Amino acid sequence: MIETFTGTTEGPDAAALRERARLSFDLDVDICIVGAGLAGLTVALEASRMGASVAVLEGRHVGWNASGHQLGTVMPGFGLPVGELIERIGFEDTKALWDLSKEGAAYVRANATEENIPGIALSEGALEVSNVDVGDQLISRLQMLAGDFETEVEGWQIDRVRSELKTDRYFHGVYFPRAFQIDGRKYVHGLAAMARRCGARIFEDTPVVSIDPSGIRKRIVTPSARLRASHIVLAGNIHLGAPLRRLSETLLPVWRYAGVTAPLGEQLAEAVGFRGSVTDTDGIDHFRIIEGDRLMWASPETTWAARPQRFAGAIARRIRTIFPKLGPVEISDTFGGAIGQTVHGMPQIGQLRKGLWVASGFGRQGLNTSAMAGQLIARSILWGDERWRLFSPFELVWAGGATGRVAGYVVGLWGRGSAAAAGALARHRERAQIQERVREARLAEANRQAGTRPAVRRPPPGQPPPRPVRPPRQPPPAKQASQAYPEPMPQAYQEPTPHDYQEQPLTRQEATQADQAQPHPEPPVPAGHREGEEAWRQG
């Protein structure tokens, strides 16, 4: 396994680097830039193109720990979400800042050509995926980016995302067709070569010992020479050193490490069909395919430095978790670097005092925002462009020192844990919904085969079941014509009422019939009459 710390001077292009030049003599220039990273080299290139004399002082070598050089994704935006930007500075200023970030991305694309930088390996498209089901949020975000901020985006539903990425870990996605990827190592050295061709002078292994920003001509002291300039641009990020320690302490150092797998062959194409870069909304996963069949994967951020080799096992396990079809993968190369993260999440771009400029704190969006900052500062110095004042609301805030690093580490752990829990819950709900649909389909098929009516859908938990609807009463069947003596219809029993028990007057006919039906006993005969009658019968 190859292990590097920054990745900018290791690898196949390391032998092509020229011999470093140190500043060993006094020098007067128009602009002195401290730091040969992405922002500093962009200022040098633009100012040299405009005719200014430029000197770049780098304490180590070109591109050492340059932010944004790892996976090389270039797209508009900042570390702070758009919604939070609008809440803080309003819609109009947010729109202006977004346009500046788009200009920065376009600037990188214009420079990253095979003519300017051979082997830059530009690839198109970036996909941002969600770990949970966010259908409604996806629609609102698409409307904001496409309508309000005039950015070309596409919304991908779950089926589309999973057709490109064979995993159930991701749900919806936002596709940026105008985003692209470049080889960050080659780009930072390509910027240096372009700046030299335009007349800029770059001195490596030349740390700054002290800076005196007072007066019209500022003074910079190095171990072996002195330099004077009308403008000083501080583009060293978290590595400005002792002379500007207070400025460095406004940035929280954040390390991120990446690994490159050994060639995976055709099985990589079966698991990952998308050829651009992929990042999740929680900032945990960031990967893309390089060299056709190798996977470059970045680890989560941490506020503590470590050897990149320590993260090889974690990266391999993460790849296997997301794409089980790949099985165990071998990490053949690891590298890493540090970025400066501000407390408010926005870059530090502006003028600290007359002639003293700062460009740092680019966070995760290093490539487009550093290009934007370099253009703004160079044009402000030489052309009077005042658009850098859009960043005035984002002041220099102390990052908390060691306490801030501990807090940042804890917040990062909490964020990753929360994202993992939310993702697991979302996948559980999805599996439950699939099982419910399968059960209903089986029940419907059974009802169809049995000839019964479909089953009533069960109500959600907490709701009472619907009351059954009684079928209408069917009318009695019609009598058949051949039935000569139909049976009498049974009469339903009715409860008698008090009226039924009252005596009703009889008609004359009813009274006669009743009298004839009753027996009439003979009237009683007196005793003397009875004896005479018996004697008469005997005689």
Would you name each region that the model predicts?
Residues 69-100:
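Glycine-rich active-site loop/strand segments that organize a redox cofactor
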Residues 49-69:
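Glycine-rich FAD pyrophosphate-binding loop
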Residues 1-31:
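Extreme N-terminal leader/targeting segments of oxidoreductases
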Residues 31-56:
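N-terminal Rossmann-like FAD-binding beta1-loop-alpha1 element of flavoenzymes
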Residues 2-12, 80-86, 110-190:
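Flavin (FAD/FMN) cofactor-binding and adjacent substrate-gating region
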Residues 281, 305-307, 312-317, 321-428:
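C-terminal catalytic lobe of FAD-dependent flavoproteins
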Residues 171-230:
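Helical element adjacent to the flavin cofactor pocket in flavoenzyme catalytic cores
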Residues 106, 114-122, 208, 226-267, ...:
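Active-site substrate-recognition segment that forms the wall
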